[in-house]
């Protein structure tokens, strides 16, 4: 089976396991109808933490996942950066400063996406589509 390869993968390979769990908090004043966590949801927050928070209720239950991650946004203030808490990943990112013309920028983008893709995969049903 083909495998995605990128520089820095060894630093982020298991990062999804170390993301701190933060339970979802219902905000009844922000919704319509009964406040519940078992239907359609809008989750406000860092997507990495939001994905981790969805696991207890939705692991293996999501039929379809569609993502539209930022890529080549042209935004000079952000070029595939990630606000990570892992010292190993932070050390790697600090040692490899991110620049728009950086030859490693796609590797850095893959490092940012990898833990999110791993968590998304955990949410996906056996018969689900990505």
Predicted regions and their residues:
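Helix-to-beta-strand junctions that scaffold the AdoMet/dcAdoMet cofactor pocket
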Residues: 123-125
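DnaQ-like (DEDDh/DEDDy) 3′-5′ exonuclease domain used for proofreading
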Residues: 1-66, 71-117, 127
């Amino acid at each position: 089976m083909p495998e995605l390869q990128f520089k820095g993968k060894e630093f982020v390979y298991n990062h999804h396991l170390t993301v701190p769990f933060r339970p979802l908090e219902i905000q009844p004043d922000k919704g319509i109808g009964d406040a519940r966590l078992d239907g359609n949801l809008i989750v406000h927050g860092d997507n990495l933490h939001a994905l981790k928070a969805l696991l207890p209720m939705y692991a293996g239950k999501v039929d379809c996942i569609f993502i539209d991650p930022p890529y080549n946004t042209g935004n000079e203030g952000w070029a595939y950066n990630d606000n990570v808490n892992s010292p190993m990943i932070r050390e790697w990112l600090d040692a490899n400063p991110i620049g728009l013309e950086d030859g490693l920028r796609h590797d850095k983008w893959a490092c940012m996406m990898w833990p999110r893709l791993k968590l998304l995969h955990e949410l996906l049903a056996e018969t689900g589509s990505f």
